[in-house]
Amino acid sequence: IHAEDLAVGYDRHVVVDDITLDVHPGGLVVLMGTNGSGKSTILRTLAGLLEPVSGDVRVLDEWPGGRAERVAYLPQHPKSLATLPLRASDVVRMGRFARLGLIGRATKEDDEAVETAMARMSVLQFRDKPLHALSGGQQQRVHLAQILARNADVVLLDEPTAGLDAQ
């Protein structure tokens, strides 16, 4: 990720400006700040969900969103899928959709990625449970497993531990 003199916000309203950032492969950056300070806006811009107000930003040498199959983003409050009849394993499998495309068929590699991600997040026991039957913390772990299953080159997590217990 490379950003120089980046300003982010909504429409022309700047929330955070003068952002200069370089994150190299294997790098880790933690954004810290008070509520409403613009952390989520920065992440949404890097994920390609918001246009930058000004400045230059590249993710994997492309404009944000240009390499969507290689970037995984978990918002602070994932959209509730609880109204859909989805099992936890279905939600985790959605992490593979960016690589499969609309008509791609899951392979053994996809199945293994889903199993491995669910095991890493300790949610294998919920595999066949409806998402809506899980607690908020369990749902968050399922969403984190979805991100892991994606095997993305860039992972953007917005408050990923919100609602999780100490284990």
What is each of the regions a protein language model found here?
Residues 130-134, 138:
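Conserved ABC ATPase signature
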Residues 93, 108-126:
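Conserved ABC ATPase "signature" region
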Residues 1, 15-16, 127:
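Conserved structural motif at the start of ABC-family nucleotide-binding domains
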Residues 47:
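Helix-to-loop junction immediately C-terminal to a conserved catalytic motif
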Residues 32-34:
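The feature captures the beta-strand-to-loop junction immediately N-terminal to the Walker
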Residues 155-159:
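Catalytic Walker B motif of ABC-type/P-loop ATPase nucleotide-binding domains
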Residues 55-69:
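Conserved ABC transporter NBD signature motif
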